[in-house]
Amino acid sequence: MIARRTLLASLAAGIAALALTGCQIDTRTPIRVSEILSVAQSGAPVPVSAAITGQFVTEPWCKDEGTMAVETISTPNVPLQLTGCAAAGNGAAGTFQLATNLIRTDGGQSDDVILTNVLEGDTARFAVFPHGKHKDLLSVGLFLNLPQLQAAQQKLLAMPVFKRGGYDGTTNFSFTIDILNDTDKPAKFYLADVSAGGDLPSDEAILTIPPGGQDTVTLDAQTQAKLGTTGWVNFMSMMTK
């Protein structure tokens, strides 16, 4: 299952948190229903931006370590930007923006093939693809380049500034999508992972967002564990009829 929260109560969540070091990394990515439909129909990528928040020991550490993280993790097609550091609680909070894309890919691919086709050597992307045997469902998946992110993490941990910061690489993280329905029809989603060809969940499992409405979907611990193993997960499935 995938946990659902309102916008006011949700934690920030989204992509690329695996490579940063700290106590807690939260990311949040807004995606519009019209963008999902446009990508599925035209195949033209749509830019999306993930807001990332990380905890640091102090504000100066945040600036130093955040700058190193940006230099280590960014790629030309998926740049990471440090947008601010401020005192928060017993430490400091760093805010980042990661620019990536929502693209279209084919369904029914093996894990290795779909990761290669979606990521194309970059760190993180979202993708829309047909959902197996359920022709009226569009899957929205999150894809991470785990080897690249893990290598970046090890490189960061070896830097003197990170060693002085006292980090051991242990990180808690969360992933959230803010779904914004900017169409004139209700948008309906299955939040449970519907296996290809498997039975659809009951109607009670459907998230309905009215025209002009919005809601938030957060990966639960089980789904995050799968993401950390396979490199991608089906975040949600959108009904097209």
Give the role of each language-model region.
Residues 1-11:
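Bacterial N-terminal signal peptides that target proteins for export
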Residues 19-22:
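C-terminal motif of bacterial Sec signal peptides marking the signal peptidase cleavage site
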Residues 53-76:
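N-terminal, post-signal-peptide region of Sec/Tat-exported proteins
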Residues 24-26:
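Bacterial signal peptide processing site
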Residues 73-241:
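Mature, soluble, non-transmembrane domains
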Residues 31-54:
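Post-signal peptide N-terminal segment of mature Sec-exported envelope proteins
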